[in-house]
């Protein structure tokens, strides 16, 4: 098969591993920087050009689109879909999951466990909003943040009011969530491929750090999932319509709570913690599914 990887840097661990996995199975692979693609959008023969050449005869595309280039990256992916190239994750599923608020609303509609989450536009509503999520401590998140950037723990109500008002003053969109103390600064990353959890790791925040992101110095270890955690992770990925997803859960007194559903989960941490060939499993999934050559929008909203 001829497989394209939408990635801006072929030296990244995840991109390198996907190239290795595909080539070792006899596939032809090309890394394509979405920002260097330009498109001919027409109803006869839609085209994508990359650095002067037309991209043709691709069987599948693996999107590894960074958060900062979501808009253009998903436009390029959508064009591949118009050309009948099989996407590992569809453009609509990626945009759905990238919008933190929209994804929380979709999960809540299906009754998936999550931290109580508040969203407001005006500083006048901050006091009511904090009452809604249970006062302090609360976690305040920038809707556009990634890798733990733009996430603040406000230990007291007073601190929460100050932080929310400061963000609002910058015209930033934020959501306010209850702090799950019993999680102890740890979360669980479940790696879902094709409706199954194929690997999971526990990420523990560094000393004195409530964020467990590995980019923030957290550590990863193997974890055994409960049946409920497994079911929750698969359901969250399905609601987003993602074939490949990293679902982040917190262990709480009321069961697993979904923090985020990531459409472009990194491979380095999960492969190191579990010893599994996750890149190979993604390519296996493509081999089984790309032959249908169809894209079908899954999930709703």
UniProtKB/Swiss-Prot annotation:
Binding site for Mn(2+) 1: 248, 260
Binding locations of Mg(2+) 2: 260, 262
Keyword list, A-Z: ATP-binding, Ligase, Magnesium, Manganese, Metal-binding, Nucleotide-binding, Protein biosynthesis
Stretches assigned to the ATP-grasp domain: 104-287
EC number, UniProt record: 6.3.2.-
Binding site for Mn(2+) 2: 260, 262
Any one Gene Ontology BP term: SOS response
Name of one Pfam family that matches: Rimk_N
Co-factor binding details: Binds 2 magnesium or manganese ions per subunit.
Superkingdom to which the source organism belongs: Bacteria
Entry binding sites for ATP: 141, 178-179, 187, 211-213
Presence of keyword Magnesium: yes
Enzyme category, top tier: ligase
Cofactors required: Mg(2+); Mn(2+)
Residues holding Mg(2+) 1: 248, 260
Family of this protein: Belongs to the RimK family.
Entry protein name: Probable alpha-L-glutamate ligase
Organism of derivation: Aliivibrio salmonicida (strain LFI1238)
